[in-house]
UniProtKB/Swiss-Prot annotation:
Its EC number is 2.1.1.-. Disulfide bonds: none annotated. It is an enzyme of class 2 (transferase). This is Uncharacterized methyltransferase Mjls_0208. Pfam families: Methyltransf_11. Belongs to the methyltransferase superfamily. One of its GO terms (biological process) is methylation. Keywords: Methyltransferase, Transferase. The keyword Methyltransferase applies. It comes from Mycobacterium sp. (strain JLS).
Amino acid sequence: MSATELFARRATLARSVRLLSEFRFEQSDPARFYGALADDTAAMVADLWQAATETTPGGRTVLDVGGGPGFFAAAFARRGMEYVGVEPDPREMHAGPAAQAGGRYVRASGTSLPFADGSVDVCLSSNVAEHVPDPWRLGNEMVRVTRPGGLAVLSYTVWLGPFGGHEMGLTHYLGGARAADRYTRKHGHRPKNDYGSSLFAVSAHDGLEWAASTGALIAAFPRYHPRWAWWTNAVPGLREFVVSNQVLVLQP
């Protein structure tokens, strides 16, 4: 069974439309947005695990690199998985469930994870790689801490895709620095995802090239696309503009 066989059945047009409709709440109602994203992500990881390992995901440890406020914890717990969140920014950790008692969270950088080699079953990073200056150092750390036969799942926003500019909208096509300056003039403050400091241009090509170099890549697909549109990820050039978010699945 291929790693994506089960998830491909879930990757319908209805799912894509449902997730797209939630994106408008990212800034105004983060609990709603991230709650929906968390449920979808946990289902995706569970499907990938079951297909790749032919075992159930219950009882497996998930290390969420860049877990932020911790909205993903409950979604993984509902699937019987042991969740550990990693977040370097204390402001993010205190903005949601991560601040509640009983959670398992570690304050650390994704590019220098304080975990032993091969110590977790699944290492996940969702929409974080585009926010660090060296995303493949983060990726290498994820592979390092994942046990042999486990899964490292790295999902990130492609810069030239329609959501590459985050809250700056499509103005990122004018250039990242220019888009950030335009946002600042309009809103009176710098964007949270500020080009060059907290947002960087990460391409689909570079992600695929890095993943192939590890020798552990077993799947790559557009995260939010319906299955019938996954072919776009195989077309150089086109994928940079139409693959809004790329998922790289690695099995050390």
